């Protein structure tokens, strides 16, 4: 993966769990292989801000509307230990028979583009 990122001139980091990460539009993204066989590749983005728990119903309504209208990314929220809402989105593909660098790059670009679009629309709609 680092080779793909370097070929695009992207800045990246490796977190303390060994996941490859990067920043796009101030949002943090992680790129990782999942499953015991490491054949599911996931692009995972985290919204660049937390949202007040008072806005939970608005967040839920926005996510429901998004999922009714869009195939991806899969979007979700979590409540943090300090009672704030943390919004994430993911694009996962099962590459059971392998993938070329070009295929992985296409998934990365799709995951980043659709996730940043989701985040931008949520920020706009909720006035964040």
What label would you give each PLM region?
Residues 24-58:
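Long, continuous compositionally biased terminal/linker segments
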Residues 4, 62-66, 125:
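Residues that form generic nucleotide/phosphate-binding pockets
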Residues 76, 80-109, 124-127:
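Well-ordered alpha/beta subsegment
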Residues 112-113:
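Long, contiguous binding/interaction regions
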Residues 19-21, 38-41, 85-87:
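Hydrophobic residues embedded in beta-strands of well-ordered beta-sheets
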Residues 1-34, 72, 78:
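Charge-rich, low-complexity N-terminal segments
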Residues 116-128:
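Flexible helix-coil linker/hinge segments at domain or subdomain boundaries
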């Amino acid at each position: 993966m680092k080779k793909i990122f370097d070929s695009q001139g992207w800045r990246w980091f490796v977190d303390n769990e060994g996941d490859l990460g990067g920043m796009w539009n101030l949002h943090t993204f992680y790129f990782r292989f999942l499953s015991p066989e490491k054949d599911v590749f996931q692009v995972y983005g985290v919204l660049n801000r937390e949202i007040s728990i008072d806005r939970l119903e608005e967040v839920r309504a926005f996510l429901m509307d998004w999922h009714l209208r869009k195939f991806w990314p899969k979007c979700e929220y979590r409540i943090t230990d300090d009672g704030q809402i943390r919004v994430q989105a993911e694009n996962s593909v099962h590459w059971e028979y392998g993938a070329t660098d070009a295929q992985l790059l296409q998934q990365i670009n799709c995951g980043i583009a659709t996730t940043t679009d989701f985040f931008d629309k949520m920020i706009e709609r909720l006035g964040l």
